[in-house]
Amino acid sequence: MSMSLGTTSDSDGTDSQSQLVNQANAAGIAVIIAMGNDGDEEVPSPAAADWSIAVGAIDNNDNVNRNDDDLASYSNYGPRQDDGDNDRWDELKPSVVAPGSNIRAAAGHANFFGDSNAQGWSTLSGTSMATPIVAGLAALLLEADGSLKPTSTTNGVRD
C-alpha cells in the first residue's frame, strides 16, 4: 500500500493513524508512506508507525553520478519521537530514501489549481514522488516471492 499523506505534527508512532498502519502490517500488507516535505527533523503520522516503510527523498543534483546524491532539502528526516518502548531501532526514520526531485509524472489536462496542461505530464518534486518508486520496488519483490512478509519486503527494499 502506497500512501502520500500525513499530519503536520511530529509523532511517536502511537497515534491512531500509525496504529492502523501497524495493523495493516500485521495482516500481511507492506505500507509505504511519504515522510513529508517540510525539511524538518520530524516524522509525521502515519509515517511514524513502527512498521511503516517511511520514504524520504534524495536529490540527484541533476546528474547521473550517484556519489553526490543528497537528502533533498525539503525531505523530512528523523529520528521519530521516542515511544517509550525501549526499542531505539523503530525511531530510525526514514526507512529508505529514493529519487524524489524533478520527477516527470503523468498529469491530467488541468492541475489542482485548474490551470491547463496540454502536455499531459508535469515535473514534480517531493517525498510523494519518491514513495511510488519504493512501492514499485516492493511490488517487484512480492512478485518474485509471493511468500514474503512485510518485514522481509522492508529488508529487501533497504538492500
Question: Which residues does each PLM region occupy?
Answer:
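Short acidic, glycine-rich surface-loop motifs adjacent to enzyme active sites
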Residues: M1-G13, A34, D145
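A generic secondary-structure signal for well-formed alpha-helical elements
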Residues: N25-G28, G56-D62, G100, L141-D145, ...
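Mature extracellular/periplasmic domains of secretome proteins
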Residues: M1-S2, G13-V31, D40-A57, D68-A98
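Solvent-exposed loop/turn segments at secondary-structure junctions
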Residues: G6-D10, N37-E41, I53, I58-N63, ...
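Hydrolase catalytic cores
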Residues: S45, G100-D159
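Generic structural "secondary-structure junction" signal
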Residues: T7, S73-P79, A105, T123, ...
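Extracytoplasmic/periplasmic, Sec-exported soluble proteins
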Residues: S9, G13-S16, D38, A47, ...
